[in-house]
Amino acid sequence: MIMIDEIQEDAAQRMDKSLNALKQAFARLRANRAHTSLLDHITVSYYGNNVPLNQVANVSVEDARTLTVTPWERQMVPVIEKAIMTSELGLNPVTAGTVIRVPLPVLTEERRREMVRLVRQEAEAARVAMRNIRRDSNHTIKELIKEKEISEDDQRRAEEAIQKITDNHITQVDELLAVKEQDLMEV
């Protein structure tokens, strides 16, 4: 039974990681307010290495629709500006000396729908990842029964427990998706 408990615990931990990754992906998509996490995934070239933007500059919220990026080194201004422009966020930074202001455009209905579509894709990818984790766990359990290390009753109970874990995590994904869709469609 210890092996089965370990398999269930492993499945739950892996599904938690998928859920956390989804939460981070959702945090990057902001509809109605500026937030520093919007630029978290942007990397810049710094002395030949790609590093996250927040390691070469201070990112702060100036107001509800503007982010301010202040590089720690003057020569990083054009590099950071280009990285923000070429990101898939559709932002146009404005540079004033060593300060880069990133105004967030007011979202059109079309852009909101596009963001909802992206959010749904992220949620579906998380669901698929969780189903794959369930499949891997069930496969491991089937291997144990082939090796006669557990009984068929143990197998059935373990598979039911893993299914409950999966259902719980997929329900959480659906709840996060509903909240995010509502957030994105608010004007």
From Swiss-Prot:
Its main location: cytoplasm. Belongs to the RRF family. GO terms for biological process: cytoplasmic translational termination. The keyword Signal does not apply. The keyword Cytoplasm applies. Responsible for the release of ribosomes from messenger RNA at the termination of protein biosynthesis. May increase the efficiency of translation by recycling ribosomes from one round of translation to another. Keywords: Cytoplasm, Protein biosynthesis. It is found in: Cytoplasm. SUPFAM superfamilies: Ribosome recycling factor, RRF (SSF55194). One of its GO terms (molecular function) is ribosomal large subunit binding. NCBIfam families: frr. Coiled coil: none annotated. Gene3D superfamilies: 3.30.1360.40, Ribosome-recycling factor. This is Ribosome-recycling factor.
